[in-house]
Swiss-Prot record:
E.C. designation(s): 6.3.1.2
Family membership noted in the UniProt record: Belongs to the glutamine synthetase family.
NCBIfam families: GlnA (TIGR00653)
Localization per record: Cytoplasm
Organism: Haloferax volcanii (strain ATCC 29605 / DSM 3757 / JCM 8879 / NBRC 14742 / NCIMB 2012 / VKM B-1768 / DS2) (Halobacterium volcanii)
Name under which the protein is recorded: Glutamine synthetase
Alphabetized Gene3D superfamilies for the sequence: Glutamine synthetase, N-terminal domain, Glutamine synthetase/guanido kinase, catalytic domain
A single GO molecular function term of this UniProt record: glutamine synthetase activity
UniProt lineage: Archaea, Methanobacteriati, Methanobacteriota, Stenosarchaea group, Halobacteria
Amino-acid positions noted as binding Mg(2+) 2 in the UniProt annotation, renumbered to this chain: 145, 200, 207
Keyword Transferase carried by entry: no
Amino acid sequence: MTEDNALTDGGLSDEAQAVIDEIEEKNVDFLRLQFTDILGTVKNVSIPASQAEKAFTEGIYFDGSSIDGFVRIQESDMRLEPDPSTFAVLPWRKKENSAAGRLICDVFNTSTGEPFSGDPRGVLKRAIERAEELGYDVNVAPEPEFFLFEEDEDGRATTVTNDAGGYFDLAPKDLASDVRRDIIYGLESMGFDIEASHHEVAEGQHEINFTYDDALSTADNVATFRSVVRAIAAEHDLHATFMPKPIPRINGSGMHTHISLFKDGENAFHDGDDEFDLSDTAKSFVAGILDHAPAITAVADPTVNSYKRLVPGYEAPVYIAWSDRNRSALIRKPAARTPAASRIEARFPDPSCNPYLAFAALIHAGLDGVEKGLDCPDPVRENIYEFDEAKREEYGIETLPKDLGGAVDALEEDEVIQEALGDHVFEKFVEAKRSEFKDYLVDVSQWELDRYLETF
């Protein structure tokens, strides 16, 4: 992550010049300038590599009114400024002896010259700045899960999984090991540090873990990860999806998100004298996330389908609690081999989220707990799924919203998470999600037809 933009008054920064040199060295002939809209969809404009210097010194202009959640047509001129630290060569070639590169961009208003308040990457930058004002650096490590499905004869996605494997299975049950290997090769060529990959619990479900990094670089990596997984799966005639629950009555896909704060180079979450090896800072950070969890859910689990995953019985968290060992809790404190690895794991985000907005919401919520010195409730070490309502009330355990509408209601009542998003993103996000939930409510599903059409 760079401190400053590469855009200068006619000259190139050293980092931008290094990218120009690498473009020439690696025979890159096209560049994809990438950014993300409010809903988390990656957008891009392609330019010839010969225009790279101009992109760095002048930016690339585009019509922001055509991007969901950006601006109205009468204020539509926007400018992309590439971040040179994000340059990577894409792991596929359209022809021999040439390559395409990728740069992630920040979005600016042309009228004011200021960062665009609706740019999700800018939203996360503001959250990081808030942490830095308190003396903290934020590290994040996500675990995005995905499904691989067969394509039909027309190349369209089906819900037929490409294998019948289960958790940690090997071939022949796991038929996607070669696909995962190719994905890993592609990711590594783009600078990812891969820790492990494996078949997940559900048929056709997979996970590839990459190491933690600062929050902005990690959000960039999530956006890149999803694009690379889809592209390489397609080369194997498979469709990769990060939809949280594509098949009913089996485990859905989550994106467990590990977070830690560092201060002066030391892990601020570690306290070796504590029963759980957690500092007061860590406990207050956990308390902040628990306090704002209903509102965060709207951002971290942003689709109607997300709430088909967030039900008891399929290893997805539903109850607002934390534990040092229990995976039925919303937040878990994983075992750490070293003090530097101390962290907390938020288990409720899913991979359909906009990573920039989800990380920003989690950071703001946690820091709110730290600033207020919130007390963390006692950990719950029992299986919360087995609690009845009376026992949950005894423990003071509340539940996450049961649907997208309830989550958006919670977001509209939570000033901290609204502040995390900023006025523009909050307004446009709520507008989009209200519309999505309304569309869902008026639709008639196949389940309803199967259940009622011949009964009544």
